[in-house]
């Protein structure tokens, strides 16, 4: 298993925030490889954050997790979800509903944060995913809800640029050298 994942053999590995591999087998393989070699794989939170609370809730019980993404119609251009009518619509329109795994197979570079969040919570097959086209919208708005009886977390992150994804890598790198980790 480790031969195909050489990056984990030479130290800790920090994948880019665009983790977009919904395959549970791949996830298990790299996890086992890191374990065999005494390494850790650090997944930056990218554009969303909140992996700690998602993981905590999922550890407490069978979490119900949903992921809602709002995007401008221009950002959907060139994808299977794009329809020309989205450019002239005056109201928000749902263009996808399914699992995070299904969403990433259709839009691997547009909703990659959903896979990272689903790995931290209920799993790609179990996260309920919806994508909406919003007229005139610039950027992305991601709303993640995870809940079990007695506990509910809602994360709502809007960003007009992808700069937050790069800074999430900086945050992970700082944690690697800091005596206090957030």
Task: Report residues per predicted region.
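Active-site-lining helix/loop region of Rossmann-like oxidoreductase modules
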Residues: 39-182
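Short strand-turn motif at the edge of the Rossmann-like AdoMet-binding core
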Residues: 15-20, 45-47
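Rossmann-fold NAD(P)-binding glycine/threonine-rich loop
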Residues: 2-10, 17-40
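Short acidic/polar active-site loop segments enriched in Thr and Asp
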Residues: 10-11, 63
């Amino acid at each position: 298993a480790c031969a195909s994942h050489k990056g984990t053999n030479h130290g800790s590995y920090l994948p880019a925030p665009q983790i977009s591999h919904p395959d549970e087998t791949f996830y298990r393989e790299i996890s086992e490889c890191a374990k065999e070699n005494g390494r850790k794989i650090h997944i930056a939170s990218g554009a969303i954050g909140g992996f700690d609370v998602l993981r905590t809730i999922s550890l407490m019980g069978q979490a119900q997790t949903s992921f809602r993404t709002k995007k401008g119609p221009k950002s959907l251009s060139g994808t299977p979800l794009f329809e020309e009518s989205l450019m002239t619509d005056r109201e928000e329109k749902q263009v996808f509903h399914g699992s995070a795994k299904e969403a990433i197979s259709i839009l691997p570079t547009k909703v990659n944060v959903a896979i990272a969040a689903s790995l931290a919570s209920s799993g790609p097959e179990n996260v309920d995913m919806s994508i909406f086209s919003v007229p005139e919208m610039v950027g992305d708005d991601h709303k993640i809800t995870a809940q079990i009886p007695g506990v509910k977390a809602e994360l709502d992150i809007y960003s007009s640029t992808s700069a937050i994804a790069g800074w999430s890598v900086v945050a992970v790198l700082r944690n690697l050298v800091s005596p206090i980790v957030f």
